[in-house]
Amino acid sequence: VYTTPGNHSRIVAKKEDALDGENMDVLLPFYLKARMQNFKNISIMDNRIEPEIAMFCIRGKTIMAAHGHKDVPANVVQSFTMMFGIKPDIVLLGHRHTNGLSTVFDTKVIQSGCVSGSDEYAVSIRKVNMPEQTVSVIDENGLVCLYDIQLS
C-alpha cells in the first residue's frame, strides 16, 4: 500500500499560505504501519523517489502515482520522465474528483474520482460529481481494462 499526500488535509486552509509537507496525510503511513503490523500480507510502503509521488512495479510495468493537485494529466508523463529519468507505463492521479483515462506518449494516465462525491467546497466552485472510482486490470502488456465504478 502506498499513500500520496494531497491538498485536502493541509493544516492551513489557504493554499497560498501552506507549506509542502504540512498536512495530515503525512501521518497516514505511520498510522497504517502500526495498525497493520500483524497482517503479513499487507505492506505499507514509503515513497522513495519523492515524498508526494509513489513509484512501484506491477507485472514488470512502472506505475507512478500522485494526488494530482500539482499535475496536469496532459503533461504529467513528461514531468515525471524529466524529474526521475524513468518513463512510466501508467500514471495514477486523483484530485479532479472524476474518473478519466488518457494516453500520453504511450503512457496511460488514469484519474480516479472521489469516493464521497462532492463536498461543500466542490459545490462552491461548481465541480459537482457523483461518487466514483476506477479499477485497473494490469498484465505483462500493461493496462488491459479500466472499470468505471459508480458508487451512488
Feature locations, PLM:
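Conserved beta-sheet core of the metallophosphoesterase superfamily
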Residues: 22-26, 33-38, 45, 50, ...
